[in-house]
Amino acid sequence: MVFFELLLFQKVKFKKILLIDIEKTDTQNHGFNQNGSGYANLINTKSFLVNNGIKSEVIKVCNPEVQKLPKFKFDLLISLFSMGFHYPCDSYLNYIIENSSDKSKVIYDKRKNIKDTGHEKLQMTFKKIKKLSKLKHDRISMIKEKNK
C-alpha cells in the first residue's frame, strides 16, 4: 500500500509525484522472479492520496504494461518490497539512470542472497548512504553524485 508514501507526501510538499505500478498480471509472484507481477490499482491509490490531502494535479500514474514510462526527472525514487525484492533492478535501471540528476536519491529493498546485476549497476551510478538490514532484505538508500 501507500501509507509510508502518504506520510512522506504530507510532510514534504512535492511538486510532482509519479506512481508506477503494474496493475494486473496473469500470475502473482511472491518470491524473487525475473518478471514482476501486478495486483495494484493506480486510480484507487491516487484517490487515496487525494482523499488524504495530496493535490490531484501533482500526481501522475503510469502502468508500464499499458503505457510508456514518461520522462520524469526525480529527486526521490522509492520502491519498497518491489524492485530489487520481487524482481531485478534491471527492470527500471535505464529509466532510473536517465531520469535522475545530481543529488537524486533512491530507496529500495534488495532481497538478500539474490544476484541482481541491476543493483550492482546502480551502485556504480549512486553512492550508498545507508543500509538497514532486515531478515530477508536490506533497505538501501543511495544518492547520485557528480562524475559517478
Each model region followed by its residue ranges:
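Conserved SAM-binding loop of SAM-dependent methyltransferases across substrates and taxa
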Residues: M1-F14, H30
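Conserved S-adenosyl-L-methionine
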Residues: Q10-I17, I22, N33, D102
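Conserved beta-strand signature within the Rossmann-like core of class I S-adenosyl-L-methionine
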Residues: L18, D102-N113
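Short "lid" loop at the C-terminus of a central beta-strand within the Rossmann-like core
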Residues: E23-D26, M83-F85, R111-D116
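S-adenosyl-L-methionine
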Residues: F32-P70
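A short SAM/SAH-binding and catalytic strip from SAM-dependent methyltransferases
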Residues: F74-C89
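A short glycine-rich, Lys/Arg-flanked "PGG" loop and its adjoining helix->strand segment in the class I
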Residues: C89-K105
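Core SAM-dependent methyltransferase catalytic element
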Residues: E120-K148
